[in-house]
Amino acid sequence: MTREELKKLPKIELHCHLDGSLSRRFLEARLGRTVLDEELSVTQECRSLAEYLEKFDLPGVCLKDEEGLEGAGYDVLHTMSQEHVCYAEIRFAPLLSVTESMNTERVIAALLRGLERGKKEFNIEYNVITCAMRHHSAEQNYQMLKTARQFLGTGVCAADLAGAEAQYPMSEFMELFQKTKDLGMPFTIHAGECGDPQNIMDAVRVGAGRIGHGIAMHGQPEIQRMVREAHVGVEMCPISNLQTKAVSGSSEYPLREFLDSGLCVTVNTDNRTVSNTSMTKELEFIQKTYGICDDEILLLMRNAAECAFAKEDVKNRLKMLMR
């Protein structure tokens, strides 16, 4: 497909962080000043994940009140509408926005108001994934997830675990996600983004419906088989992973390997603004770099419809679009 055809293609995105995907327009309006390119996005010269994460300081400041959260929800759907995204799951960590005057419930409700406004204006279906953070205590994370559970089916669709994977392995969170499962809340887990493939196995064993990144399965056919047989979706984010040096170079990135292994692979942006990317750019990149053909691009979209944390009627509509 040409770039224009890719842009017009109805697209599904399942792994998109709110704070890493806010537009320059939104950030400048909130901050009341011009924002420089180097404050917004990394370049190809990005040396590490630590350097990549520095870009999140600015958007974090803008998500500390209800007006900011509501505006952010609207803003991210506006951005997505410009490239024909028809369904998106937006993830964020509510506890990073909690203040003395704004509790978790108000944080989530504010974001949902903005997303609902965006849905009506731009005709994009959405859901929210609430992220537990690895550096927060088990009690903090569980209380947040209990609050998020109140919104399940009315804007929130699932939970996630994000943060420093190497420092806080999945084994430390098995009890938390067993409790999450007991709450009746589906979840995805950032696992195998860097380092230990054991985190992927633990995520699957505790009941994750999807895993974020999963690149530590590279060259691990037994783990790939485990993921495939458990029908666990794999949320891949090629451009972001190359920028953070999660792999040493594009030839080491296992997208083709995972597709050929029969995994339910999806392609996503991760952080639209920080990575200076879009779904169109991601698809164009994998076409050129990995020889992904048109039928495989449609397969990636059908996979996304299949493993979305959406209601069945929404999933069925998405599948019809991706035929």
Regions found by a protein language model. Name each.
Residues 1-185, 194-199, 205, 209-210, ...:
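Metal-cofactor-binding active-site regions of metalloenzymes
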